[in-house]
Amino acid sequence: MAKLKITLVRSLIGRPEAQRKVVRALGLGKTNSMVEQNDSPIIRGMINKVAHLVKVEEA
């Protein structure tokens, strides 16, 4: 299964609680933190919810 490298590039300060929870569920914490996740429809949906906060690359 393909992997995605997800990096949090924008701060969560002032963001709605729902977006904060999605970022935490992806495994991200502070700005510039990076995590690798399997490419699945569930992860893609989570990325779409916070696309303006993260950068996604194929790993």
UniProtKB/Swiss-Prot annotation:
CDD domains: Ribosomal_L30 (cd01658). InterPro entries: Ribo_uL30_ferredoxin-like_sf, Ribosomal_uL30_bac-type, Ribosomal_uL30_CS, Ribosomal_uL30_ferredoxin-like. The keyword Ribonucleoprotein applies. One of its GO terms (biological process) is translation. Belongs to the universal ribosomal protein uL30 family. PANTHER family: LARGE RIBOSOMAL SUBUNIT PROTEIN UL30M, MITOCHONDRIAL RIBOSOMAL PROTEIN L30. This is Large ribosomal subunit protein uL30. It comes from Desulforamulus reducens (strain ATCC BAA-1160 / DSM 100696 / MI-1) (Desulfotomaculum reducens). The lineage of its organism: Bacteria, Bacillati, Bacillota, Clostridia, Eubacteriales.
